[in-house]
């Protein structure tokens, strides 16, 4: 199965989370994982993927302009139905607790629903999600005054999302 992680990152925080998600997905031996910054991400690759995970820093509860521009270019894939039944998941970072993590993830999920994708979140029984995460995806607060780019809890949350996407994708593609 092929999984594509696409991210926008301005201060490296979201890149660290994207890399953790890719690591988690790679724990499944059947997963072939690709990861690209949105500036290098090729929308033509999406047709060949079984799962697509995209994310960005939250900007007042909305998608970063870099990722939004990229998503807006997916119209022809929608017209051709190329992403229908592909697994999708999202992730986001913000600088403050009230930076709009969940609103940003809602905004990231919406285009996936329009594309006909099967959106996967993190259920409450995922240990990493119980106290630190969100049901909508991996959302991590990275305070600007912190010495570390990402907390260990944030990295573990990212890995958990990657594992979940690869597990669900494996289950869905096993019968093909």
Swiss-Prot record:
Residues 3-162 form the Flavodoxin-like domain. PANTHER family: FLAVODOXIN-RELATED PROTEIN WRBA-RELATED (PTHR30546), FLAVOPROTEIN-LIKE PROTEIN YCP4-RELATED (PTHR30546:SF23). This is Uncharacterized protein YhcB. GO terms for cellular component: membrane. It holds the Pfam family FMN_red. The gene is yhcB. GO terms for molecular function: FMN binding; NAD(P)H dehydrogenase (quinone) activity.
């Amino acid at each position: 199965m092929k999984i594509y992680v696409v991210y926008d990152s301005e201060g490296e925080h979201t890149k660290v989370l994207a890399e953790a998600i890719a690591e988690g997905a790679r724990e499944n031996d059947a997963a072939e994982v690709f990861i690209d910054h949105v500036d290098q991400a090729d929308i033509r690759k999406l047709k060949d993927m079984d799962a697509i995970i995209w994310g960005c820093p939250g900007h007042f509860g909305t998608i970063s302009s870099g990722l939004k521009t990229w998503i807006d270019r997916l119209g022809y894939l929608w017209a051709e139905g190329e992403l229908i039944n592909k697994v999708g998941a999202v992730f986001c970072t913000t600088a403050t607790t009230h930076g709009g993590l969940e609103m940003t993830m809602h905004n990231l999920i919406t285009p996936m629903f329009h594309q006909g994708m099967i959106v996967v979140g993190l259920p409450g029984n995922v240990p990493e999600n119980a106290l630190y995460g969100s049901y909508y995806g991996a959302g991590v607060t990275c305070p600007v005054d912190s010495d570390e780019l990402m907390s260990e809890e944030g990295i573990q949350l990212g890995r958990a999302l990657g594992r979940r996407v690869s597990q669900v994708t494996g289950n869905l593609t096993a019968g093909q």
